[in-house]
């Protein structure tokens, strides 16, 4: 996905990640893990099918014999506006299950909860980034078209919805793993807002995703240690963790401070850049 130069090749490898991720979600072989794995396969396959229809419409709109990114980007300005808009909507909705954006974000949250912590770290970073990159490349394809302002507006709306939904569920959950999963939805919403704003917001969005990857993976791995100590992921049960694992508790606290974008953390800097571009 990261190195593909062709839209169809990127789509194939994103579909492959669905099958690979389902296996690690079912690692514990419990009824809950089985349900989450099947849900992940079904919803992601539905999303990927929607993205495939979007790619077909994109090919029809540009009348390209090749789906190489460079070829499609060169032909996109002459494409039908209706086809391009419909194609982008389908691709955005389809890949939202991978990028953990509204509307198909729920499947990633459930998969993270059922999977072992290292697998959750992979899903919330590597797979989410793959979905984000696929959307970013389509975003770049349409940059020279007449529908690009509309594309940015849609991304801005999706970003705001993802941010709001993630923030609302963050307040309601008492489970550390779900807390981190909804935090991913919130942070990917911020990245989508950066793309929707454009300009320096695009670079801020990429920087935000990279920093989120480093922080979130470390937090999921530390949560695995917490579960070994307490046997669960309940937030209100780990108040004395600093007396049991001082180094781990400091690392967990530091990661949470960075995750909530407390200045001068890198996530604060990326959000500040997006805010400055918004009011510019």
What is each of the regions a protein language model found here?
Residues 1-8, 20-280:
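Hydrophobic transmembrane alpha-helices and their helix-loop junctions in integral membrane proteins
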């Amino acid at each position: 996905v990261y190195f593909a130069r062709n839209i169809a090749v990127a789509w194939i490898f994103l579909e492959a990640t669905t099958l690979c991720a389902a296996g690690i979600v079912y690692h514990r072989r419990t009824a809950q893990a089985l349900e989450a794995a099947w849900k992940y396969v079904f919803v992601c396959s539905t999303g990927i099918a929607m993205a495939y229809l979007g790619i077909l419409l994109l090919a029809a709109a540009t009348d390209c014999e090749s789906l190489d990114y460079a070829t499609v980007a060169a032909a996109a300005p002459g494409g039908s506006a209706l086809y391009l808009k419909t194609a982008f909507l389908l691709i955005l909705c389809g890949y939202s299950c991978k990028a953990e954006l509204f509307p198909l974000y729920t499947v990633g949250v459930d998969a993270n909860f059922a999977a072992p912590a290292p697998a959750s770290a992979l899903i919330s970073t590597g797979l989410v980034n793959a979905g984000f990159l696929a959307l970013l490349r389509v975003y770049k394809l349409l940059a020279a078209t007449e529908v690009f302002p509309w594309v940015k507006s849609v991304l801005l709306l999706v970003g705001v919805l993802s941010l709001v939904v993630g923030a609302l569920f963050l307040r309601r959950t008492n489970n550390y793993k779900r807390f981190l999963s909804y935090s991913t939805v919130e942070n990917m919403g911020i990245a989508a807002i950066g793309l929707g704003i454009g300009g320096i917001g695009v670079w801020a969005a990429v920087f935000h995703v990279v920093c989120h990857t480093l922080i979130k993976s470390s937090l999921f791995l530390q949560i695995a240690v917490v579960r070994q100590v307490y046997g669960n992921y309940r937030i209100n049960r780990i108040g004395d963790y600093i007396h049991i694992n001082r180094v781990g508790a400091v690392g967990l606290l530091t990661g949470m401070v960075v995750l909530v974008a407390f200045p001068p953390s890198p996530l604060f800097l990326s959000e500040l850049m997006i805010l400055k571009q918004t009011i510019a």
